[in-house]
Amino acid sequence: MAGKLRVHELAKKLGVTSKELLATLKEQGEFVKTASSTVEPPVVKKMKQFYGVAQESKPTTPPSPLAQAGSVPDSTQRGPKPGAKPAAKPEAAPKPGTAAAKPSAKPSPAAAAKAAPAAKATPTPAEAAPKPGQAAAKPAAKPGQKPARAAGKPGPKPGPKPGARPQRVANNPFSSTTERPPRPRGGATPGDMPRPGGTRGGAGRGQAPRPGARPAQGQGRGQGTAKPGAARQGGGRRPSPAMMPATPSPGQMPAKSAAGFGGGRGRGGRPGGPGGPGGPGGPGPRGGRGGRRGGTAGAFGRPGGPPRRGRKSKRQKRNEYEAMQAPKVVGGVKLPSGNGEKIRLARGASLADFADKINADAAALVQALFNLGEMVTATQSVSDETLQLLGDEMDYKVEVVSPEDEDRELLESFDLQFGEDEGDDEDLAQRPPVVTVMGHVDHGKTRLLDTIRKENVGSGEAGGITQHIGAYQVSVNMEGVERPVTFLDTPGHEAFTAMRARGAKSTDIAILVVAADDGVMPQTVEAINHAKAAEVPVVVAVNKIDKPTAQPDKIRGQLTEYGLVPEEYGGDTMFVDISAKQGQNIDQLLEAVLLTADASLDLRANPDMDAQGIAIEAHLDRGRGPVATIIVQRGTLRVGDSIVVGDAYGRVRRMIDEHGNDVQEAGPSRPVQVLGLTSVSGAGDNLLVVDEDRTARQIADRRDARRRNALAARSRKRVSLEDLDEVLKETSTLNLILKGDNAGTVEALEDALLKIEVDDEVALNIIDRGVGAVTETNVHLAAASDAVIIGFNVRSEGKATEAANAEGVDIRYYSIIYKAIEEIEAALKGMLKPIYEEKEIGTAEIRQIFKASAVGLIAGCMVETGKVRRNAKVRLVRDGKVISEDATIDSLRREKDDVTEVSHGYECGMVLSYPNIEVGDRIEAYEMVEVPRD
């Protein structure tokens, strides 16, 4: 059984290039990568039908002589060329199918053969068969014809010398494998016409030389621009492979006659005048040089005469082209050259992903990076800098796709879009504004939110539910119309920054709370910068005006420096003086919010499309499972919809409003709690309704894989060969398991901990994170990985505490994020190797030396400064030179008693670990003291 065809083999059979066939296969949806890829038999059959239909559907044109130089055409597929030898005096218009009747169609073999010998008294150039060199002038000529070949160079060489042996035609006259057209009838036969070299000969018959034969060096190329009425000494020009009909069959061939001159094989002179009377290859009207003396080699397809460089095959051309594309040598490894090509890679991509983009070997990329000083594996997520470095070395422009672009491309692959309203303007309806309150911690932001809730919600319903959901709606009576306003109760502005960074347009207006008795604080300036970066209009609430020290005008002047100019000063920012504690001017603040929304924003959305929104908060409820707080931005969310929120997905089983009531649907700007997700989503993740659960699961899985790759690339430290020895040393690692009350808290805590920079000797590794209480599973994981569990606003449940005590797992509970960060930073510093510095404690001078057989030399010393201690390190200095750097005091005595130290002004005897001592030597005692790490 024959093996499968490869792409280049099939391309050769179909007569196309491998590049064209590869492009066609990829358009058909077949999985092929290179020209060496195998092709299944059904695909081979389909490609043969495809190219067969393509060839039959378009008119064929005569191939150029160079294109036919190396192959024998099949007469059943490639008939005689439209440039067959024209008669000197055409008799009439050619038969249908000839090039004269249909310039864009290829003549049949019989018609072309009949048109060649036809002759009449009156020549008709318009009806004559097309001549080479005129093909470019015909309007229906194909672009494949090359008229430059027909027009020869001026001053051609003379034809072959007289006496040349007759040459056999290129095609084997005894071959019966190809079908040949019948001999032309009617008119003067080619044998009756005078030939260029004399009488009709074997090479002068009206049969074409073999198209595949190659003319010898110097064989004539006739100048194919002879005029129709010009005198023709030979009765016509010698045919060329592009102009002559196919060789007739042996039964149709005329008998051979005497050989004539000028019987050059292959492409002899074209239909121009081959020479003067009786002169082989003499000058004719725009005639070309005649062919050289032909040989029998022409009958077998080999050139006669001096050798000529043959035409390169497709394989040779392809090899030369690939050789021109010299590979880049990066670190001693040959890699493909990009030539400035742009490559898009996702954040956290691996070298295997890079290699797949450029059709290279991932192992070669690993070796190249290793030689460049970077140590990574093929499947390891690498940083953006490493990808840029490798791309620059190979001349590729690496573009790391941002998370927003990557998510948009992911949704487009599922034919989904996020962030645009569907339909026309008449489909859009008004929606309530979404307002976020920002400001300094002590400026009354929380009190303002509580005041608004108490005025619009009953005191019995304003408890934990509203605080827990983090968002609520209030109604404002403006000009007799009740208008709802949605408030986000997200503590602090860190979550606001994260949402802006993700591009979520969840906030329409920001209320900036500034205390009238305190002024503009650093967090106030930070909040202003957040609002400006998000291009959100700001309404300033000057709070605490009921205090005696309040200075509202001073606040207005300070905020003017930051671009918030009050309306009374000629600006466009609304300022409202309020007292959140007294409930003063709260209605005016809400009206100012609505006026700003009407003047600055187009608050419209399509309520009839599939819902899209944003998750502002998510947590794990013990009885209800993962719960996400959603604000619908456009469309309507209904119970039963299949949704995907970040890397979490599920079906909406239940929706709860800010009052704890169940709702069946939520329109634009409506905050609700959604139950039914499979996992806890992240704060700021986008919500999208899809058609089915399978699509939601696929989107969530791909987002989760992307997030893990990006996290791995961000947390991985670049290891180079220079610091390999340091890396291989024992490194202290603090493993942590984070548990929090909601996803936003866990995310903020994780980001803050990963930003702690202590030293390269210690590392922080967060092995697990989650929402909810500390479970027994967390304890077992911490015990196996020697980790510390950090619980933020949560406690342990069940037997988790007992398991932690039994296995020695440390669980730390925190309710303030800054305290958790400080303690973990201190723990990391405590894991550092201590740094010691030298501290001098005293000096002594050797006054006398005693010898003892038991201990050796004893130095009698006087303590000059400080004190000396037993076992202390000493430095022995003689004449200003250090004799010993790290000697120790092995024995210390005062009189006859062993002592631990001797103070300044006292004599003592000591035995040193360094025996080479002399009188007058100076002893400097010191100790190594640990220095606290910053």
UniProtKB/Swiss-Prot annotation:
| Localization | Cytoplasm
Molecular function (GO) terms for this protein are: GTP binding; GTPase activity; translation initiation factor activity
Region G1, as annotated, extends over: 439-446
Keyword set, alphabetical order = Cytoplasm, GTP-binding, Initiation factor, Nucleotide-binding, Protein biosynthesis
InterPro entries assigned: EF-G-like_DII, IF2_II, IF2_N, P-loop_NTPase, Small_GTP-bd, T_Tr_GTP-bd_dom, TF_IF2_bacterial-like, TIF_IF2
List the GO cellular component terms.
cytosol
Q: Where is the composition biased (Basic residues)?
A: 308-317
| Keyword GTP-binding recorded | yes
Q: Which Gene3D superfamilies match?
A: 1.10.10.2480, P-loop containing nucleotide triphosphate hydrolases, Translation factors, Translation initiation factor IF- 2, domain 3
Q: Specify the tr-type G domain's residue ranges.
A: 430-602
Q: Which PROSITE patterns match?
A: G_TR_2
Region annotated G4, chain positions:
543-546
Q: Which Pfam families match?
A: EF-G_D2, GTP_EFTU, IF-2, IF2_N
Q: Where is the composition biased (Low complexity)?
A: 80-154, 185-197, 206-231, 238-250
Region (G2) residue ranges read 464-468
Q: Where is this region: Disordered?
A: 54-323
Show the segment(s) annotated as G3.
489-492
Which CDD domains does this entry report, sorted A to Z?
IF2_eIF5B, IF2_mtIF2_II, mtIF2_IVc
Biased-composition ranges for Gly residues? 260-303
Keyword Transcription regulation on this protein?
A: no
User: Quick one: which residues bind GTP?
Assistant: 439-446, 489-493, 543-546
Region annotated G5, chain positions: 579-581
Under HAMAP family, the record lists:
IF_2_B
Its job:
One of the essential components for the initiation of protein synthesis. Protects formylmethionyl-tRNA from spontaneous hydrolysis and promotes its binding to the 30S ribosomal subunits. Also involved in the hydrolysis of GTP during the formation of the 70S ribosomal complex.
Q: Which family does it belong to?
A: Belongs to the TRAFAC class translation factor GTPase superfamily. Classic translation factor GTPase family. IF-2 subfamily.
Name by which UniProt lists this protein: Translation initiation factor IF-2
Q: Record the organism.
A: Corynebacterium urealyticum (strain ATCC 43042 / DSM 7109)
* This protein's encoding gene: infB
